[in-house]
């Protein structure tokens, strides 16, 4: 993402600005305009926001522009599979989120996903995006027990700043359940 946006590594970004700039650059790229590569804006926006929800739920604060990439194949341009995904809120040095939504959508570890969906209404219908996020949120129910079954250390599972113990309550507060 940093290379596409021509930004220096480590610079703080705002999600909505990044999304719009990426959409513009990709839609106006030679690959799309001249070669006819397919780029689904709604699918991209949905996946971007869904990945941020997953980062938040799993305590992965390391969401800088080098941890997101694109690939192109015969079906078009899309995000690569998720990589470099770990509960970085557990890092003793404290890894802050470098890409944020900004207030009033994100403040003090709380998120207003309804407002996030409205912010992106020029790219996707807010109801559609919120519905897709609700589906992802439902899949996060029971995450704590599934992670324990897979052997995630208790030190991570119980660390308050990672926040795995109260995911359903947070999802309800954020309007996703």
Tell where the protein language model's regions lie, with residue ranges:
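Anionic ligand-binding catalytic core segments
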Residues: 1-65, 69-177
């Amino acid at each position: 993402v940093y290379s596409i946006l021509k930004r220096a590594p480590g610079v703080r970004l705002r999600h909505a600005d990044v999304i719009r700039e990426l959409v513009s650059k990709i839609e106006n790229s030679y690959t799309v305009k001249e070669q006819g590569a397919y780029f689904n804006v709604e699918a991209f926006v949905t996946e971007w926001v869904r990945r941020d929800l997953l980062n938040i739920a799993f305590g992965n604060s390391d969401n800088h522009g080098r941890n997101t990439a694109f690939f192109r194949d015969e079906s078009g341009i899309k995000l690569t599979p998720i990589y470099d995904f770990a509960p970085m809120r557990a890092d003793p040095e404290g890894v802050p989120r470098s890409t944020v939504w900004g207030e009033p959508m994100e403040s003090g570890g709380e998120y207003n996903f309804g407002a996030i969906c409205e912010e992106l209404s020029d790219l996707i219908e807010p109801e559609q995006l919120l519905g897709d996020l609700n589906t992802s949120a439902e899949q996060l129910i029971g995450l704590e027990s599934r992670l324990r079954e897979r052997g995630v250390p208790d030190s991570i599972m119980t660390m308050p700043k990672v926040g795995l113990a109260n995911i359903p309550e947070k999802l309800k507060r954020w309007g996703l359940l």
